[in-house]
Swiss-Prot record:
The gene is panB. Catalyzes the reversible reaction in which hydroxymethyl group from 5,10-methylenetetrahydrofolate is transferred onto alpha-ketoisovalerate to form ketopantoate. Its cofactor is Mg(2+). This is 3-methyl-2-oxobutanoate hydroxymethyltransferase. One of its GO terms (molecular function) is magnesium ion binding. Binds 1 Mg(2+) ion per subunit. NCBIfam families: panB (TIGR00222), PRK00311.1 (NF001452). Residues 1-33 are annotated as: Disordered. Pfam families: Pantoate_transf. The keyword Repeat does not apply. It is found in: Cytoplasm. The active site is at 207 (proton acceptor). Its EC number is 2.1.2.11. GO terms for cellular component: cytoplasm.
Amino acid sequence: MSDSKSSASTSEDRLYGSAPSHDVPKRKTRTHHLQAMKAEGERWAMLTAYDYSSARIFEEAGIPVLLVGDSAANVVYGYETTVPVTIDELLPLVRGVVRGAPHALVVADLPFGSYESSPEQALASATRFMKEGLAHAVKLEGGERVAPQIAAITAAGIPVMAHVGFTPQSVNSLGGFRVQGRGDAAEQLVADAIAVQEAGAFSVVMEMVPAEIAGQVTRKLTIPTVGIGAGVECDAQVLVWQDMAGYTSGKTAKFVKRFGNVGDELRSAAAAYATEVRAGTFPAEEHSF
């Protein structure tokens, strides 16, 4: 590198901060790695991510799988449910996450209305996320009813993560946020999980499912199960990162554990910044050129 290029790089680092160093050797996470981890009894964590900066942090924390969820409808765009969010709204988020976490397996949610009509519609939507979003896999909700869609997508060489139990896109038809798979419904949940595996899914999310049933499904399937409100026997767990880190305020679901208080920290930092600006103490001499 020439002295001029080195000097320019140093100047940019001073202005904007240098890129993070990745001291720990990492491999690119792929679907067969997750399959091997299930075989070895090794659990793994998945988080949602919606931008470059959070994805970078989660990769540094050792999270192997990141989901650009349609939950962006709630935490990014402020919709009340996941139903309104579109492919065009999700694609830029996927691209940012892929760039921020080059070693993670990045899964993109197919939003409501983008796959239900036919296998052809599902494949077209999944292809957009792979070509335009650079995602590594897609996720869609439903069991037996979407098995043809899963089969069509996987036949085209696109990995699919399935999602059974409570499916947020169907919140209106399910009568609200309710635990699924209780009583007589347990048999259908098991059938749904088997159907998505047979259709070619590489893993399946189980949301708001009784822990006992989720454990039975996990033992029955050869693909990894990912729990969210489905007990500890699943092969992996997933949470929305804003819930996990305490970024969101107000009441959270029973299955959420807050591992931090990011919201309080950010609020305090913003308030301190505003106070110093009003007082004329920021920027100080050391922050000026």
